[in-house]
Amino acid sequence: MKSYLVGGAVRDALLGLPVKDRDWVVVGATPQQMLDAGYQQVGRDFPVFLHPQSREEYALARTERKSGAGYTGFTCYAAPDVTLEADLLRRDLTVNALAQDADGAIIDPYGGQNDLRKRLLRHVSPAFSEDPLRVLRVARFAARYAHLGFRIAEETQALMAAIVEAGELAHLTPERVWKETESALTTRNPQVFFQTLRDCQALKVLFPEIDALYGVPAPAKWHPEIDTGLHTLMTVTMAAMLSPDVDVRFATLCHDLGKGLTPKALWPRHHGHGPAGVKLVEQLCARLRVPNDIRDLAKLVAEYHDLIHTLPILQPKTLVKLFDSIDAWRKPQRVQQIALTSEADVRGRTGFEASDYPQGRLLLEAWEVAQSVSTKEVVAAGFKGAEIREELTRRRIAAVAQWKEQRCPQPQG
């Protein structure tokens, strides 16, 4: 009975990255031996145990055989005669098929260390194509390690495209697609995840609303990159630089979905694309079962991002109404989130990456001014019932108007 550290912990240690989770494989043991040693069994589908002290996961070495459709259609075989090499063979990428023994020696039967040096994401065996979830996993790894120069091997890209072409992605549950997407959105380069999916034709299957933006032009004066799909990924790149918040990054991804609905006869203009995009955001989020708070911000950003760009000329009444519409009084974080997504939109354009975005600062200033109006003072002044809200709104508009005269003076004449 021997235990080996496996997978991501070995990979990240070799890359000099922090190791977060440590997983182990046990060779030559039975479930009863693990229980007798004080381990707690937690795996339903195959034997996984928690260490009595560290609570880290220890799985019995196993092999997998395809027995049904999708990423759950596997029959597992775990027994003392399963070797470490056989266990590592079932893994997705060579860089994940690494193990380390108790003495620190690396076991690398499939060339994972060489691929780490080459910065290559390459599948271990042809069995890669039996699991459609691996299309998303590899796209996520590509995003996670893009800053280190990793790329996907051509032969692995070909297998990913074959999985998509065979219709295997239909077997993925919405929850699993969202989980992988959410994880990809936390990486340094989330745009790589979506570009990778597009390269293997998976984007139009899983995110047709985003795929529809490719080939849709915008006015070259405002969008030198012209293509709305390119612009979308440029804004996601910028959002990742501006904020670690998944809500902000996802909302940025969805901000221009409405442009995919513009009739070709009206191109390259997209009047009203913001409100039009709200329904597409709802559609995408319902299909992937995106959490409500993330969905709601994305809807607001789709509807109002163009309005924020015109902030210096907005009427005080319009600004206060905007704060009402985004429910800022109860969810004040939305003001900052919407400011960041709007900035990502403006800077996510060819040649505008280093642009200043004063509208974001002005939005936050206007919010501070509107928020400073005291509800207690309104109540103390004798207003009751519906009058309180009306007077609050009046005072907020007056305060924002006074601030705006100083910060955004209008030209005379």
From Swiss-Prot:
SUPFAM superfamilies: Nucleotidyltransferase, Poly A polymerase C-terminal region-like. Mg(2+) binds at residues 21, 23. Transmembrane segments: none annotated. GO terms for biological process: RNA repair; tRNA 3'-terminal CCA addition. Its cofactor is Mg(2+); Ni(2+). Magnesium is required for nucleotidyltransferase activity. Nickel for phosphatase activity. Pfam families: HD (PF01966), PolyA_pol (PF01743), PolyA_pol_RNAbd (PF12627). GO terms for molecular function: ATP binding; CCA tRNA nucleotidyltransferase activity; cyclic-nucleotide phosphodiesterase activity; magnesium ion binding; phosphatase activity; tRNA binding. HAMAP family: CCA_bact_type1 (MF_01261), CCA_bact_type2 (MF_01262). Belongs to the tRNA nucleotidyltransferase/poly(A) polymerase family. Bacterial CCA-adding enzyme type 1 subfamily. Monomer. Can also form homodimers and oligomers. A single active site specifically recognizes both ATP and CTP and is responsible for their addition. This is Multifunctional CCA protein. The gene is cca.
